[in-house]
């Protein structure tokens, strides 16, 4: 399973760790992903999604039904 948010599409990005002596080593910045069950009232069931914290805020703002319809239309689930 990939580390990608199903709502926003955010995935890992790369960058550098930089020490006090300005030595640079490569690293990955991972998104804050959570497995979360959302209750969908229209379907009378839970839907389990792998979403970032930002994705959860989007669902809170727009509603799970709207977001779920967009995800299904895009073929992500």
From Swiss-Prot:
> What is one term from the GO cellular component aspect held by the record?
cytosolic large ribosomal subunit
Question: Where are the annotated segments for Disordered?
Answer: 1-20
Annotated GO molecular function terms are: structural constituent of ribosome
Q: Does the keyword Transmembrane helix apply?
A: no
Q: Which UniProt keywords apply?
A: Ribonucleoprotein, Ribosomal protein
Q: Which GO terms describe its biological process?
A: translation
Family annotation (NCBIfam families): L28
PANTHER family in the record: 39S RIBOSOMAL PROTEIN L28, MITOCHONDRIAL, LARGE RIBOSOMAL SUBUNIT PROTEIN BL28M
Provide the family line. Answer: Belongs to the bacterial ribosomal protein bL28 family.
The identity of this protein, by name, is Large ribosomal subunit protein bL28
Organism, by scientific name, is: Pseudomonas fluorescens (strain SBW25)
Q: Highest lineage ranks of the organism?
A: Bacteria, Pseudomonadati, Pseudomonadota, Gammaproteobacteria, Pseudomonadales
């Amino acid at each position: 399973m990939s580390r990608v948010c199903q709502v926003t599409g955010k995935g890992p990005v790369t960058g550098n760790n930089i020490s006090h002596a300005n030595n640079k080593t490569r690293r990955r910045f991972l998104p804050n992903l959570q497995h979360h069950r959302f209750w969908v009232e229209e379907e009378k069931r839970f839907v389990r999604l792998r979403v970032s914290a930002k994705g959860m805020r989007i669902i809170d703002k727009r509603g799970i039904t709207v977001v779920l319809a967009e995800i299904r239309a895009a073929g992500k689930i």
